[in-house]
Design a protein with these regions (language model features):
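Acidic, surface-exposed loops and disordered segments
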Residues: 1-346
Length: 346
Protein backbone atom coordinates (compact mmCIF):
# COMPACT_ATOMS: atom_id res chain seq x y z
CA UNK A 1 0.00 0.00 0.00
CA UNK A 2 1.25 3.52 -0.68
CA UNK A 3 0.79 6.88 1.00
CA UNK A 4 -2.58 7.31 -0.75
CA UNK A 5 -3.93 4.73 1.72
CA UNK A 6 -3.00 7.00 4.62
CA UNK A 7 -5.18 10.09 4.20
CA UNK A 8 -4.18 12.90 6.54
CA UNK A 9 -6.68 15.60 7.51
CA UNK A 10 -6.37 19.31 6.84
CA UNK A 11 -6.70 21.22 10.11
CA UNK A 12 -7.93 24.28 8.22
CA UNK A 13 -10.99 22.28 7.18
CA UNK A 14 -12.31 21.80 10.74
CA UNK A 15 -16.11 22.32 10.51
CA UNK A 16 -16.42 24.71 13.45
CA UNK A 17 -19.98 25.72 12.58
CA UNK A 18 -21.25 22.23 11.77
CA UNK A 19 -23.34 19.98 14.01
CA UNK A 20 -21.77 17.92 16.77
CA UNK A 21 -21.69 14.68 14.78
CA UNK A 22 -19.84 16.29 11.89
CA UNK A 23 -17.27 17.80 14.25
CA UNK A 24 -16.84 14.46 16.00
CA UNK A 25 -16.23 12.61 12.75
CA UNK A 26 -13.61 15.21 11.79
CA UNK A 27 -11.78 14.65 15.09
CA UNK A 28 -11.76 10.92 14.40
CA UNK A 29 -9.56 11.57 11.36
CA UNK A 30 -6.80 12.21 13.88
CA UNK A 31 -7.73 9.29 16.12
CA UNK A 32 -7.17 6.78 13.31
CA UNK A 33 -3.58 7.97 12.79
CA UNK A 34 -2.61 6.35 16.10
CA UNK A 35 -0.07 3.52 16.25
CA UNK A 36 -1.23 -0.03 16.94
CA UNK A 37 0.26 -3.48 17.39
CA UNK A 38 1.16 -4.87 13.92
CA UNK A 39 -0.81 -1.89 12.57
CA UNK A 40 -3.94 -3.88 13.42
CA UNK A 41 -5.96 -0.68 13.98
CA UNK A 42 -8.37 -2.44 16.37
CA UNK A 43 -10.73 0.46 16.96
CA UNK A 44 -14.30 1.30 16.05
CA UNK A 45 -16.35 4.39 16.90
CA UNK A 46 -20.03 5.14 17.21
CA UNK A 47 -21.07 8.79 16.89
CA UNK A 48 -24.43 10.15 18.01
CA UNK A 49 -24.98 13.84 18.65
CA UNK A 50 -22.11 14.98 20.94
CA UNK A 51 -21.20 11.46 22.08
CA UNK A 52 -18.43 9.25 20.69
CA UNK A 53 -18.51 5.62 21.80
CA UNK A 54 -15.11 3.95 21.58
CA UNK A 55 -15.00 0.23 20.82
CA UNK A 56 -12.20 -2.34 20.77
CA UNK A 57 -12.54 -4.46 17.65
CA UNK A 58 -11.65 -7.89 18.96
CA UNK A 59 -11.79 -9.39 15.48
CA UNK A 60 -8.42 -7.66 14.97
CA UNK A 61 -6.82 -9.09 18.09
CA UNK A 62 -3.56 -11.01 17.64
CA UNK A 63 -4.78 -14.08 19.47
CA UNK A 64 -1.38 -15.83 19.52
CA UNK A 65 0.93 -12.91 20.35
CA UNK A 66 -1.65 -11.07 22.45
CA UNK A 67 -4.04 -13.67 23.90
CA UNK A 68 -5.25 -11.49 26.78
CA UNK A 69 -5.81 -8.39 24.62
CA UNK A 70 -3.25 -6.22 26.40
CA UNK A 71 -1.84 -4.77 23.17
CA UNK A 72 -5.33 -4.51 21.69
CA UNK A 73 -6.50 -2.14 24.42
CA UNK A 74 -3.22 -0.22 24.53
CA UNK A 75 -3.70 0.44 20.80
CA UNK A 76 -7.25 1.70 21.36
CA UNK A 77 -5.92 3.95 24.13
CA UNK A 78 -3.50 5.50 21.63
CA UNK A 79 -6.40 6.36 19.33
CA UNK A 80 -8.32 7.80 22.27
CA UNK A 81 -5.41 10.10 23.16
CA UNK A 82 -5.16 11.37 19.58
CA UNK A 83 -8.87 12.15 19.67
CA UNK A 84 -8.50 14.16 22.88
CA UNK A 85 -5.42 16.04 21.67
CA UNK A 86 -7.27 16.98 18.48
CA UNK A 87 -10.33 18.09 20.44
CA UNK A 88 -8.15 20.36 22.57
CA UNK A 89 -6.53 21.83 19.47
CA UNK A 90 -9.90 22.86 18.05
CA UNK A 91 -11.31 24.19 21.32
CA UNK A 92 -13.76 21.32 21.71
CA UNK A 93 -13.82 20.43 25.39
CA UNK A 94 -14.64 16.86 26.28
CA UNK A 95 -14.94 14.37 29.09
CA UNK A 96 -14.01 10.69 29.04
CA UNK A 97 -15.97 7.96 30.79
CA UNK A 98 -14.40 4.51 30.86
CA UNK A 99 -16.71 1.52 30.81
CA UNK A 100 -15.82 -0.67 33.77
CA UNK A 101 -15.17 -4.38 33.30
CA UNK A 102 -18.26 -5.16 35.38
CA UNK A 103 -20.55 -2.87 33.37
CA UNK A 104 -19.20 -3.75 29.93
CA UNK A 105 -21.62 -5.79 27.80
CA UNK A 106 -20.29 -9.00 26.31
CA UNK A 107 -20.26 -7.52 22.83
CA UNK A 108 -21.03 -4.45 20.78
CA UNK A 109 -21.43 -4.04 17.04
CA UNK A 110 -19.75 -6.92 15.21
CA UNK A 111 -18.44 -8.40 18.47
CA UNK A 112 -16.61 -5.16 19.37
CA UNK A 113 -16.40 -4.22 23.05
CA UNK A 114 -17.52 -0.80 24.26
CA UNK A 115 -14.61 0.50 26.34
CA UNK A 116 -15.10 4.27 26.68
CA UNK A 117 -17.39 7.17 25.85
CA UNK A 118 -16.19 10.66 24.96
CA UNK A 119 -18.68 13.50 25.35
CA UNK A 120 -17.94 16.69 23.48
CA UNK A 121 -18.81 20.08 24.94
CA UNK A 122 -17.54 23.45 23.79
CA UNK A 123 -18.06 24.81 27.29
CA UNK A 124 -15.63 22.44 29.04
CA UNK A 125 -12.07 21.82 27.93
CA UNK A 126 -9.90 18.77 28.45
CA UNK A 127 -7.21 21.06 29.85
CA UNK A 128 -9.07 23.67 31.85
CA UNK A 129 -6.06 25.84 32.72
CA UNK A 130 -5.07 27.50 29.46
CA UNK A 131 -3.64 30.66 31.01
CA UNK A 132 -0.08 29.50 30.42
CA UNK A 133 1.18 30.29 26.95
CA UNK A 134 3.70 27.47 27.35
CA UNK A 135 0.94 24.97 28.06
CA UNK A 136 -1.04 26.16 25.06
CA UNK A 137 2.07 25.95 22.91
CA UNK A 138 2.73 22.40 24.03
CA UNK A 139 -0.80 21.28 23.17
CA UNK A 140 -0.38 22.75 19.70
CA UNK A 141 2.95 20.94 19.30
CA UNK A 142 1.40 17.64 20.35
CA UNK A 143 -1.38 18.10 17.82
CA UNK A 144 1.08 18.85 15.03
CA UNK A 145 3.00 15.71 15.97
CA UNK A 146 0.01 13.43 15.30
CA UNK A 147 0.61 13.47 11.54
CA UNK A 148 4.42 13.53 11.90
CA UNK A 149 4.79 10.64 14.36
CA UNK A 150 6.50 7.51 13.03
CA UNK A 151 7.63 4.27 14.60
CA UNK A 152 11.39 4.28 14.11
CA UNK A 153 12.96 0.84 13.63
CA UNK A 154 16.49 2.17 13.10
CA UNK A 155 19.38 1.89 15.57
CA UNK A 156 19.44 4.89 17.89
CA UNK A 157 22.40 7.15 18.53
CA UNK A 158 24.06 7.18 21.94
CA UNK A 159 23.40 10.84 22.75
CA UNK A 160 21.25 11.25 25.83
CA UNK A 161 17.63 12.32 25.96
CA UNK A 162 17.18 15.72 27.67
CA UNK A 163 16.24 15.39 31.32
CA UNK A 164 13.43 17.91 30.80
CA UNK A 165 11.79 15.54 28.30
CA UNK A 166 12.08 12.56 30.64
CA UNK A 167 10.52 14.57 33.47
CA UNK A 168 7.65 15.56 31.18
CA UNK A 169 7.01 11.93 30.26
CA UNK A 170 6.95 10.94 33.93
CA UNK A 171 4.52 13.75 34.75
CA UNK A 172 2.24 12.82 31.86
CA UNK A 173 2.25 9.15 32.84
CA UNK A 174 1.34 10.02 36.42
CA UNK A 175 -1.47 12.27 35.15
CA UNK A 176 -2.79 9.32 33.14
CA UNK A 177 -2.79 7.18 36.28
CA UNK A 178 0.02 4.83 35.22
CA UNK A 179 3.67 4.31 36.09
CA UNK A 180 6.75 4.87 33.95
CA UNK A 181 10.12 3.19 34.43
CA UNK A 182 12.97 4.86 32.52
CA UNK A 183 15.96 2.54 32.14
CA UNK A 184 19.10 4.51 31.32
CA UNK A 185 21.69 2.31 33.03
CA UNK A 186 23.68 0.39 30.35
CA UNK A 187 23.92 -2.77 32.46
CA UNK A 188 20.16 -3.00 32.91
CA UNK A 189 19.59 -2.26 29.23
CA UNK A 190 21.92 -5.16 28.42
CA UNK A 191 19.79 -7.43 30.59
CA UNK A 192 16.65 -6.26 28.81
CA UNK A 193 18.39 -6.92 25.49
CA UNK A 194 19.09 -10.49 26.64
CA UNK A 195 15.38 -10.91 27.42
CA UNK A 196 14.61 -9.55 23.95
CA UNK A 197 16.82 -12.21 22.33
CA UNK A 198 15.10 -14.99 24.24
CA UNK A 199 11.65 -13.61 23.44
CA UNK A 200 12.32 -13.52 19.71
CA UNK A 201 13.78 -17.02 19.70
CA UNK A 202 10.84 -18.42 21.67
CA UNK A 203 8.20 -16.74 19.53
CA UNK A 204 9.70 -17.69 16.20
CA UNK A 205 9.93 -21.27 17.42
CA UNK A 206 6.11 -21.30 17.52
CA UNK A 207 4.52 -22.09 14.11
CA UNK A 208 1.23 -20.46 15.14
CA UNK A 209 3.04 -17.22 15.99
CA UNK A 210 4.84 -17.24 12.65
CA UNK A 211 1.57 -17.89 10.82
CA UNK A 212 -0.17 -15.01 12.60
CA UNK A 213 2.69 -12.61 11.94
CA UNK A 214 2.79 -13.76 8.33
CA UNK A 215 -0.90 -12.98 7.85
CA UNK A 216 -0.42 -9.37 8.94
CA UNK A 217 2.71 -8.93 6.86
CA UNK A 218 1.08 -10.53 3.83
CA UNK A 219 -1.87 -8.16 3.63
CA UNK A 220 0.38 -5.10 3.56
CA UNK A 221 -0.65 -3.83 6.99
CA UNK A 222 2.95 -3.00 7.88
CA UNK A 223 3.37 -0.70 4.91
CA UNK A 224 5.26 -2.94 2.48
CA UNK A 225 4.37 -3.10 -1.19
CA UNK A 226 2.51 -6.15 -2.49
CA UNK A 227 5.54 -8.15 -3.63
CA UNK A 228 7.62 -7.32 -0.55
CA UNK A 229 4.66 -8.20 1.68
CA UNK A 230 4.20 -11.59 0.04
CA UNK A 231 7.92 -12.40 0.21
CA UNK A 232 7.98 -11.33 3.86
CA UNK A 233 4.95 -13.47 4.61
CA UNK A 234 6.58 -16.59 3.15
CA UNK A 235 9.89 -15.91 4.90
CA UNK A 236 8.25 -15.48 8.30
CA UNK A 237 6.13 -18.60 7.91
CA UNK A 238 8.74 -21.01 6.62
CA UNK A 239 12.18 -19.81 7.72
CA UNK A 240 13.63 -20.03 11.23
CA UNK A 241 14.24 -16.32 11.83
CA UNK A 242 14.33 -16.38 15.62
CA UNK A 243 18.10 -16.17 16.06
CA UNK A 244 18.43 -13.44 13.44
CA UNK A 245 15.56 -11.38 14.83
CA UNK A 246 16.81 -11.83 18.37
CA UNK A 247 20.28 -10.61 17.48
CA UNK A 248 18.95 -7.64 15.51
CA UNK A 249 16.40 -6.57 18.11
CA UNK A 250 18.75 -6.95 21.06
CA UNK A 251 21.13 -4.54 19.33
CA UNK A 252 18.24 -2.12 18.88
CA UNK A 253 17.58 -2.28 22.62
CA UNK A 254 21.19 -1.59 23.58
CA UNK A 255 21.47 1.22 21.03
CA UNK A 256 18.75 3.22 22.78
CA UNK A 257 19.81 5.61 25.56
CA UNK A 258 16.43 5.02 27.21
CA UNK A 259 14.26 1.93 27.45
CA UNK A 260 10.88 2.94 28.87
CA UNK A 261 8.29 0.65 30.42
CA UNK A 262 4.77 1.81 31.21
CA UNK A 263 3.19 0.00 34.15
CA UNK A 264 -0.21 -0.34 35.79
CA UNK A 265 -1.33 -1.30 39.28
CA UNK A 266 -4.02 -3.64 37.98
CA UNK A 267 -4.89 -5.62 34.87
CA UNK A 268 -8.17 -3.95 33.90
CA UNK A 269 -9.17 -2.75 30.46
CA UNK A 270 -9.24 0.83 31.77
CA UNK A 271 -5.63 0.56 32.93
CA UNK A 272 -4.57 -0.70 29.53
CA UNK A 273 -6.40 2.16 27.84
CA UNK A 274 -4.67 4.60 30.17
CA UNK A 275 -1.29 3.08 29.32
CA UNK A 276 -2.13 3.50 25.63
CA UNK A 277 -2.99 7.14 26.20
CA UNK A 278 0.25 7.68 28.12
CA UNK A 279 2.31 5.99 25.42
CA UNK A 280 0.80 8.01 22.60
CA UNK A 281 1.32 11.22 24.54
CA UNK A 282 4.94 10.18 25.07
CA UNK A 283 5.29 9.43 21.36
CA UNK A 284 3.81 12.80 20.41
CA UNK A 285 6.05 14.56 22.92
CA UNK A 286 9.09 12.77 21.55
CA UNK A 287 8.13 13.62 17.98
CA UNK A 288 7.68 17.29 18.86
CA UNK A 289 11.18 17.26 20.41
CA UNK A 290 12.82 15.60 17.40
CA UNK A 291 13.20 12.26 19.18
CA UNK A 292 12.46 8.75 17.95
CA UNK A 293 10.21 6.11 19.53
CA UNK A 294 9.97 2.37 18.87
CA UNK A 295 7.54 0.08 20.77
CA UNK A 296 8.86 -3.45 21.34
CA UNK A 297 6.30 -5.88 22.71
CA UNK A 298 7.99 -9.27 22.38
CA UNK A 299 9.24 -9.58 25.97
CA UNK A 300 5.79 -8.76 27.31
CA UNK A 301 4.22 -11.39 25.04
CA UNK A 302 6.11 -14.26 26.73
CA UNK A 303 4.73 -14.76 30.22
CA UNK A 304 7.84 -15.92 32.09
CA UNK A 305 10.03 -13.29 30.40
CA UNK A 306 7.51 -10.64 31.32
CA UNK A 307 7.85 -11.79 34.93
CA UNK A 308 11.65 -11.56 34.66
CA UNK A 309 11.35 -8.01 33.34
CA UNK A 310 9.09 -7.12 36.24
CA UNK A 311 11.64 -8.50 38.70
CA UNK A 312 14.50 -6.69 36.94
CA UNK A 313 12.64 -3.39 37.26
CA UNK A 314 11.55 -4.06 40.85
CA UNK A 315 7.90 -3.47 40.01
CA UNK A 316 6.45 -5.43 42.90
CA UNK A 317 2.68 -5.66 42.45
CA UNK A 318 2.65 -3.41 39.37
CA UNK A 319 2.43 -4.95 35.91
CA UNK A 320 4.63 -4.03 32.93
CA UNK A 321 2.20 -3.21 30.12
CA UNK A 322 4.12 -1.49 27.32
CA UNK A 323 7.82 -1.20 26.47
CA UNK A 324 9.43 1.20 24.04
CA UNK A 325 12.81 2.60 23.00
CA UNK A 326 13.41 6.35 23.16
CA UNK A 327 16.29 8.32 21.71
CA UNK A 328 17.81 10.03 18.70
CA UNK A 329 17.84 8.37 15.28
CA UNK A 330 17.86 9.12 11.59
CA UNK A 331 14.29 9.57 10.33
CA UNK A 332 12.34 6.46 9.35
CA UNK A 333 10.26 7.28 6.29
CA UNK A 334 8.03 4.20 6.58
CA UNK A 335 4.37 5.19 6.58
CA UNK A 336 1.95 2.43 7.42
CA UNK A 337 -1.53 2.58 5.84
CA UNK A 338 -4.65 3.53 7.75
CA UNK A 339 -8.31 2.64 7.43
CA UNK A 340 -10.39 5.74 6.67
CA UNK A 341 -12.83 6.99 9.27
CA UNK A 342 -15.73 5.72 7.17
CA UNK A 343 -14.48 2.16 7.67
CA UNK A 344 -14.35 2.39 11.47
CA UNK A 345 -17.74 3.97 12.14
CA UNK A 346 -20.50 1.74 13.49
Amino acid sequence: MDDASRPEPDAAAFPADADAETRAEFLLRYAVLAPSSHNSQPWLFGVEDDEIRVYADESRQLTVADPDGRELYVSVGCALENLLVAAERFGVGCTVEYVSDDDRPESGPDAARHVATVRLDRESAVVTDRESAAATGRESALFDAIADRRTNHRPFRSESVPESVLERLETDAASAGVGLELVTDPARRERIAALQTRADERQFDDPSYRAELGRWIGDGSLGAGWLAARVGQLAVRYLDMGAREGKKNSKLVTSAPVVAVLTADDDTVESRLRVGRAFERAALTATSEGLAVHPMSQILEVEDLRAELSELLGLGESEPVHLFRLGHADPDATRTPRRPVEDVLV
